[in-house]
């Protein structure tokens, strides 16, 4: 089964329990030890879906939905998909597991019903809608939704955008989004996360990051997160 903290936990509030003992340990850690603070005061226990994970983000203006290139996030801290889940140790785009047929199914049977359902409840959803998916033998299933861009998927997806992101987001806000506004490069991108020692349980703080001046290739970008800049 899967044990989840019901609140925000920076992408780390999920434990895939292989045994009853692991499930009990996860529940106790969240609800008694409060490892996620108030976010773990209530938990969700779900079926553990078997398949390959993928993320499909979409631009939405309230009525029009334009999916982005698919991506796959890798959450385990160690190589070979081992260790605890993190906020994401890397991602690549596009994800081959999301075939054109699956992409169409997700758009029509998952994204559109969500946007339409929100509208029926008086919510005009505009911006980025993130669908975390499990591609199973029975087709795509929803793992989670986020009302934001994915991290680290975005770092792999947006460099492939062949257009003006600001104009696209403005169209989302104004309700004038069209599919022909969004174009993608015929390429692939990969994002690799560098994290401090101890992550994700208790990250070491204060380490100096050096060597970034060596990153001088046109097709390589460095994105910063959770750090403090101080002058030499």
Model-based region annotation:
Residues 1-18:
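Hydrophobic alpha-helical hairpins/lids featuring a short glycine-rich hinge
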Residues 2, 30, 177-179:
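A generic local structural motif
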Residues 2, 44-46, 223:
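Structural detector of well-ordered beta-strand residues that form the stable sheet scaffold
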Residues 4, 87, 192:
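Residue-level signal for inorganic ion chemistry
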Residues 13-154:
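Internal nucleotide-binding/catalytic subdomain
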Residues 106-129, 146-219, 224-226:
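Active-site "cap" helix and flanking loop/linker of ATP-utilizing ligase/carboxylase catalytic domains
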Residues 229-232:
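Conserved small/polar residues in nucleotide/adenosyl-binding loops
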């Amino acid at each position: 089964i899967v044990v989840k903290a019901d609140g925000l936990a920076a992408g780390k509030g999920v434990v895939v329990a292989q045994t009853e003992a692991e499930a009990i340990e996860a529940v106790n850690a969240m609800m008694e030890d409060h490892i996620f603070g108030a976010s773990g005061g209530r938990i969700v226990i779900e079926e553990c879906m078997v398949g390959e994970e993928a993320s499909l983000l979409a631009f939405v203006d309230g009525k029009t939905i334009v999916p982005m290139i698919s991506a796959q996030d890798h959450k385990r801290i160690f190589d070979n998909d081992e260790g605890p889940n993190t906020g994401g140790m890397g991602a690549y785009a596009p994800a081959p597991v999301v075939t054109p047929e699956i992409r169409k199914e997700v758009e029509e049977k998952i994204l559109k019903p969500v946007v339409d359902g929100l509208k029926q409840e008086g919510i005009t959803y505009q911006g980025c809608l993130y669908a975390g998916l499990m591609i199973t033998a029975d087709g795509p299933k929803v793992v989670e939704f986020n009302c934001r861009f994915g991290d680290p998927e975005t770092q792999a997806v947006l460099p492939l955008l062949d257009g003006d992101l600001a104009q696209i987001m403005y169209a989302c806000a104004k309700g004038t989004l069209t599919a022909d506004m969004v174009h993608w490069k015929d390429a692939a991108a990969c994002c690799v996360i560098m994290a401090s020692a101890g992550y994700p349980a208790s990250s070491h703080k204060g380490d100096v990051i050096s060597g970034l001046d060596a990153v001088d290739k046109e097709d390589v970008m460095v994105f910063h997160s959770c750090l403090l800049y101080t002058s030499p």
